[in-house]
Each structure stands twice: as structure tokens, then as C-alpha cells.
Amino acid sequence: MAEHKRKTVFVQGAVSAQFVADSIAKHSSKTDIGAHSIFLGQVRRDEKDGKFVQAIDYTAHEEMANEQFHRIREDAFEKYPLTCMHIHHSLGAVAAGEISLFVFTSSPHRRAAIDACNEIVERIKNEVPVWGKEVLEDGEYVWKTN
């Protein structure tokens, strides 16, 4: 199978709702698609020792992360009959309530779109060198674990 074009995954700050909506809208003309599956990772306002998380500040080893994102994409295209796939992950500060991860898969049939999306999200969380520092309301921070 031919390798797919390498895609830019990282965005500075939150993934906007408008970006997600525009991504969905662009696929309405692709009539060979029968199903989409979307995962949106949102920053929670968790409580840590009596203080609330205000944001997560994401950092990454970008070169390694981009290589791993590409490998995950290639593996998913090889395993599932996907028409399209998009992955976008935040770098920098993302406030509680905002989106930090957007995974969007499309296929002629729902099972492939759903299974691929789920597998991609799990692999990102387990394999990609991205770290989140939870910034608390008093300015202190806690390193997040997946």
C-alpha cells in the first residue's frame, strides 16, 4: 500500500469548535463515505487537593510525536477501509472546557470508522510523546498521566 501524505497534527492552543464543524462540513460532498466517527478530547476542570484545574499546558517531543502520529495513521489505513482520517492535537495552554484532541475517521461503513477512531485514540494516549501539565487555579501544576 502506498504511504499517505504526512499531515500536520499539532495546533497551538485549543482545537476550535469552528474548526471541527468546518472539517465535518468539508466531507458532505464525499459521497463514497457512509459513516464518520469523531473523538473530541476536552480538558476537564478536575479537583486536585482542593484546587481546580484551570488548563492543561501541552508539550511534546515534536519530531518523535509527528513520526508516531504518521505511523498510527498508516497502520489505521492499512487495517481499516478508511476514506479519510484527521488527527489534531493541541500544544500550549488549553483551558478547561476546550478541545485538545480531535480525531475524525470516515469510511463507507460505520464499524470501520468507529473501530479505527477508538484504536487511534488509544494508541495516541499510549504511544505518542505528548505531555500535559495541569495548571491549577493558584498557578501550581501537576504533571498529567494518561
Description of each model-found segment:
Residues 1-99, 108, 112-118, 122-146:
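N-terminal, polar/charged subdomain of small-to-medium soluble alpha/beta proteins
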